[in-house]
Amino acid sequence: MTKSIKMWLLGIFSLCFLLPVKALQPQDSIRFSLLTCAPGSEIYALFGHTALRYQNFSDQTDLVFNYGMFSFNTPHFVFRFVKGETDYQLGITPYPYFESEYALRGSSVYEQELNLTPAEKWKLLSLLEENYRPENRVYRYNYFYDNCTTRARDQIERSIDGTVVYPEGKEGKTFRSIVHEFTAGSSWDELGIDLCLGAEADKPIDSRLQMF
């Protein structure tokens, strides 16, 4: 879902703080958390944001794997965003930088620790590292199917030894109805997005698709 305008600048710190996977071993000192950020007023932040926090207490590592990095300097950014033609990428930033960005704009950040085994933590870290390779980190953002939330969810699902069972979503929900919940106070943004949505956006969706 999504992202913060200034946080792409912090990507330059990534190489300084990222640890090689081979140097880490599965252990209880590692913790992964899901970060859920409250929506903002800018069009790219209307739907909130999701990221993954990685902590290794043995060496005080505290990083955020953030699929919401982008450059607002991209020509015609807002127009391209509404049309679904914006490229995003995975970035890695120190957690204090990530948290302070949302604190400065008065948005809450909620954290949920993931109940993973040591082996699952190892696999999740490996998947994120693979995604961070230069040839893999950039992706074409999509409101519903490929964004910060779906990418974090997909990596968690791939790391788990088993199947994730989600609670039932609210009946009758559609992509469009959920979009309207978040754009109620931004009529022009809502209109622009509505114009780009097709008939598929009006079909009922299950709980997994409602996560976008």
Residue ranges with predicted function:
Residues L24-F212:
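Soluble extramembrane regions of membrane proteins in the secretory/endomembrane system
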Residues M1-P26:
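Bacterial Sec-dependent N-terminal signal peptides
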